[in-house]
A protein has these predicted regions:
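Short, basic amphipathic alpha-helical segments that act as recognition/interaction helices
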Residues: 165-185
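Catalytic donor nucleotide-activated moiety binding site of glycosyltransferases and closely related
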Residues: 23-52
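TIR-domain catalytic/interaction hotspot
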Residues: 44-70, 81
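Short, glycine/polar-rich helix-capping loops at beta-to-alpha or helix-loop-helix junctions
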Residues: 102-111
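Short acidic-hydrophobic, aromatic-tinged amphipathic segments that line or gate anion-handling sites
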Residues: 115-130
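Conserved TIR/SEFIR loop-to-helix hotspot centered on a Trp-containing motif
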Residues: 77-88
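A short helix->loop->beta-strand "cap" motif at the edges of active sites that frequently abuts
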Residues: 92-96
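Short Lys/Arg-rich basic patches
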Residues: 134-154, 159-163
């Protein structure tokens, strides 16, 4: 599968290790990752580009997103450019995994009602499982995506279990259901 990866170029000085971990995790799952435009670019390079160079790059960026199977955006460091790329991917109906490692989820995206947009807090312990779940969703190997509302008390419990067992909340819930299915056969 072809994946378009994006993240803040300015935030790279603080989060490069996280960016590389995400890219390597995607590659380990046999994904072709488009990421050089983030990893190999600098703020000063971008400022030095001419208008024509910026327009040419923008056309290339649109092509990469259009040709990708899905997008992964690391959004811990806020970026209007990353937000624009996410909006473009949404317009093209691409599945998008928004990742953030600290703080709150991106406020304009986390509460957006779009089943193709998934926003997850991650750590290196659960990153691989989160990406596996998302790839399975994109491939359609999951029967369906099921979204439901839970109380704050349940959300708090899920967060605690997720951290202590170092697994995504969705994996924990799936295991509970699978155990119950076996018990009730």
């Amino acid at each position: 599968m072809k994946v378009y990866f994006t993240a803040s170029i300015v935030g790279k000085k603080h989060h490069l290790g996280d960016y590389l971990k995400i890219i390597e995790t995607l590659k380990s799952k046999n994904c072709e990752v488009i990421s050089d435009h983030i990893i190999n670019s600098s703020e000063s390079q971008i400022r030095m580009e001419t208008r024509e160079e910026r327009l040419k790059f923008h056309r290339q960026l649109e092509k990469w997103i259009r040709e990708s199977d899905f997008m992964v955006a690391e959004t811990t460091f806020p970026s209007i450019s990353v937000g624009y790329e996410i909006s473009l991917a949404q317009h093209l109906l691409k599945p998008i995994l928004i990742l953030y490692s600290t703080g709150s989820p991106p406020s304009l995206l986390a509460h957006h009602k779009d089943e193709k947009l998934v926003c997850e807090k991650y750590s290196s312990d659960i990153l691989s499982d989160l990406i596996d779940d998302f790839i399975n969703y994109v491939k359609g190997t999951n029967d369906s995506r099921f979204t439901f509302f839970i109380t704050a008390k349940i959300a708090s419990f899920l967060e605690k279990v997720s951290k202590s067992e170092k697994i995504p909340k969705s994996v924990y819930l799936r295991k509970l259901i699978e155990q119950d299915m076996q018990y009730k056969r």
